[in-house]
Amino acid sequence: GQQIPNDKYYTKTPYDDSIVYDELKEEMQRQSEYNDSLKALKGYAQENLAYMGDLTDTYEGRRNQLILDTYGERAIHSFYDQTGLGAYLKYDFSSLLVLLLLLLGISPIISSEKETGMAPLLASSRFGRHKTIAAKIGAMALFTAFFAACFFLMDFLYYMVAAEFHGAGSALYTLIDFKYTPLTCTIWQYILLQWLAKWLGMIAVGLFFVLLSSIFRETYPVFILGTGLIALFMTVGERFRLFNPISMLTFSEQAQELSTFNFFDYPVLTITALPISILLLVFVLVLLILSHRYVL
């Protein structure tokens, strides 16, 4: 017969409670065991430091201390169904679509002027040469920001409506794929950070397209080489990730674990060094574009 609602059950009936439990038990168990897994990880780091003795002022010693400092105060105290948030943060396909649109839109940005014979006229004008190129770089950044914002918002709204974002105010490490992240932000803050990271990566790729367009006098080789450049960036992947703009488009992969590299015996977080190195790449690309001998 029909079950009578009872306030002692979360869903008012024992049957519905059992259904909810079956759906969420793995995630509930994972979150309940999170504190124990961190305790084991910190214990391992402490054992390493004790074993090193006086050698703690080395890369490995400092790295183990970084592990203790990063994970020292972490704990999960509440439970949310974060399946939708996890799926959204792993979705990167729209970034590839934006790159293809950038390739189509940016390839002729300078080469088309050479094809139509406008380059000499612009070069002889009062605001030609560097000012014109600087304006084109700014237009490329705005063009990139517009398309990136459109796709970011569409993805965000779709997942927010279809999957629902429960517990987005929780710490990022409460998500199963980010349980060992070195970042200390909330999920909402990370979403904004990921948007900025992807936009920076797209700007870097767009500058490569502008550089190619400044070299060639026709658009089709720019388009062909630009396509090959995207494929190259996707192929080299992790091997050159510090100077690979695609690493910013797959920012979630970089943020999921505590990854470091040795910098004069000090552990530097990859997630910190990555945006700095891409900003340096952007600066170098801008200088190359402005100083290239084929520019106007």
Question: What are the functions of these language-model segments?
Answer:
Residues 1-47:
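Membrane-proximal extracellular/periplasmic loop immediately following the first transmembrane helix
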Residues 31, 37, 41-113, 134-215, ...:
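Secretory targeting signals
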